[in-house]
């Protein structure tokens, strides 16, 4: 498949800037697929600001689909979805293209593994983790969050693959009866150590 015939997918983030984890993600994209990563700049200091950003997300993403001819959209950032629960359906209706979210796709992956209890690693605070846990509970998955702080927001960007591995290893040893480890929040980037974890 030539580049001109590649499937063109939008990957929209509520963040305002390009994260280093995007480079790791793009390295996984197969031939024949073009992924446009588009930061939308929907919050400045706190993920809680996203509770008021659903309309802006909808407008910006709908415009990008029309301008760039995206065949589908991946909406990143669990905090966006858990604070704007109707956003995925509104995006599907407004854009007319398939839309998935971080939570929807990750939940589907956990179900494919028949995992009913997962250790959930995030760079979020306790209140945001509670919302993520509520979503997962509604999907039939018992979420277990580590007792130790993983570093929230931009601080999580400074973690090396070795540090992410050690955090996950320690959290797994402290958790009971989990069937999977689920990384939510790519700022806590596990891509450099997934094979070692498995």
Locate each region found by the language model:
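Short Gly/Thr/Asp-enriched flexible loops that form oxyanion-binding sites at enzyme active sites
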Residues: 82-93, 133, 191-198
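Periplasmic-binding protein-like
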Residues: 12, 70-77, 119-120, 178-185
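N-terminal glycine-rich anion-binding loop in soluble enzyme alpha/beta folds
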Residues: 1-57, 121-163
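Glycine-rich phosphate/diphosphate-binding loops that line cofactor/substrate pockets in enzymes
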Residues: 2-5, 66-68, 107-116
């Amino acid at each position: 498949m030539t580049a001109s015939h590649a499937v063109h997918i939008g990957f929209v983030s509520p963040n305002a800037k390009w994260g280093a984890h995007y480079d790791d993600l793009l390295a996984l994209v197969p031939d024949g697929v073009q992924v446009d990563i588009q930061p939308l700049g929907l919050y400045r200091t706190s993920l809680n600001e996203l509770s008021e950003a659903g309309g802006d997300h909808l407008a910006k993403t709908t415009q990008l689909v029309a301008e760039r001819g995206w065949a589908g959209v991946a909406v990143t950032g669990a905090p966006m979805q858990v604070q704007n629960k109707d956003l995925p359906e509104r995006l599907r209706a407004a854009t007319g293209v398939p839309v998935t979210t971080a939570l929807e796709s990750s939940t589907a992956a956990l179900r494919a593994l028949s995992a009913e209890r997962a250790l959930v690693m995030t760079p979020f605070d306790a209140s945001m983790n509670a919302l993520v846990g509520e979503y997962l509970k509604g999907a039939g998955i018992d979420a277990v969050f580590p007792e130790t702080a993983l570093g929230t927001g931009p601080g999580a960007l400074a973690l090396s693959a070795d540090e992410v591995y050690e955090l996950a290893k320690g959290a797994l040893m402290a958790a009971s009866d989990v069937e999977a480890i689920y990384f939510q929040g790519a700022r806590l980037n596990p891509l450099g150590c997934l094979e070692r974890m498995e």
